[in-house]
Swiss-Prot record:
This is 3-methyl-2-oxobutanoate hydroxymethyltransferase. HAMAP family: PanB. It catalyses: 3-methyl-2-oxobutanoate + (6R)-5,10-methylene-5,6,7,8-tetrahydrofolate + H2O = 2-dehydropantoate + (6S)-5,6,7,8-tetrahydrofolate. Its EC number is 2.1.2.11. Its cofactor is Mg(2+). Pfam families: Pantoate_transf. Binds 1 Mg(2+) ion per subunit. GO terms for cellular component: cytoplasm. It comes from Sodalis glossinidius (strain morsitans). The active site is at E179 (proton acceptor). Catalyzes the reversible reaction in which hydroxymethyl group from 5,10-methylenetetrahydrofolate is transferred onto alpha-ketoisovalerate to form ketopantoate. Homodecamer; pentamer of dimers. GO terms for molecular function: 3-methyl-2-oxobutanoate hydroxymethyltransferase activity; magnesium ion binding. The keyword Magnesium applies.
């Protein structure tokens, strides 16, 4: 069973690790068999599985259902599950919803936001619910950002993101996802935090990498983000593509410069 202790050890050893989104038992089993030890049941399922144009319509019930499916397929992986949009607006709501995801099989819940979430993170941790933070491009805030844009490019934004990351760690977060930020900022955050940092569109400097499974397998086609790579394009079956993904992350080949933001 992969645990957060393994990820901490890998960070200390500077050993890169690979993660991916998963939404059903069949793909979760295949991913686990190819060596992926960390999976995320992301609210990205609203776009990849349900056909919405954002993650906002996803419900807690959706997340619970897919978390159960993935856990059945990959019983030994470290499994993260997103708390969906507006499911952590109050302390009571947050604790109840996080408990539902944990009962469904999650090892950790992920929520989007900065320092304003400190009390929430602290409260969850005190109640034995491990927390993964998510900074940078946070898709639930798409209407605030005015679209899916790179974050932290100016000095003010970069300093704020770093401060948010420190605050989340101090509040008890055990893991952090960093999305769509410049490589230099990702390097600062990864170096300054003692907790593992997983990047997506954040360069090869983070402790681990994650991709949406449809992007990694070329299913999204022309709509795939620039930081993604189609690992199925080189030929072979899905299992071979996943093995390439794992191998390229662990050897530092992915993400390359063309998959990163300067």
């Amino acid at each position: 069973m992969t645990t957060i202790s393994h990820l901490r050890k890998w960070k200390q050893q500077q050993r890169k690790f690979t993660s991916i989104t998963a939404y059903d038992a069949a793909f979760a089993r295949l991913f686990a068999e190819q060596g992926i030890k960390v999976m995320l049941v992301g609210d990205s399922l609203g776009m990849t599985m349900q056909g919405h144009d954002s993650t906002l319509p996803v419900t807690l019930e959706d997340m619970v259902y897919h978390t159960r499916c993935v856990r059945r397929g990959a019983p030994s992986c470290l499994l993260l599950a997103d708390l969906p949009f507006m499911s952590y607006a109050t302390p009571a709501q947050t604790f109840e919803n996080a408990a539902a995801l944990m009962r469904a099989g999650a090892n950790m819940v992920k929520l989007e936001g900065g320092a304003w979430l400190a009390d929430t993170v602290n409260g969850l941790t005190a109640r034995a619910v491990p927390v993964c933070g998510h900074l940078g491009l946070t898709p639930q805030s798409v209407n605030i950002f005015g679209g899916y844009k790179i974050q932290g490019r100016d000095a003010v934004g970069a300093d704020q993101l770093l401060a948010d990351a420190r605050t989340l760690e101090q509040a008890g977060a055990q893991l952090l996802v960093l999305e769509c930020v410049p490589v230099a900022l990702a390097e600062r955050v990864t170096h300054e935090l003692s907790i593992p940092v997983i990047g997506i569109g954040a360069g090869a400097v983070t402790d681990g990498q994650i991709l949406v499974m449809q992007d990694a397998l070329g299913i999204t086609g022309d709509s795939a983000p620039s930081f993604a790579k189609d690992f199925l394009a080189a030929g072979g079956d899905i299992a071979a593509a996943v093995r390439r993904y794992v191998q390229e992350v662990e050897t530092g080949q992915f993400p390359a410069a063309e998959h990163s933001f300067q």
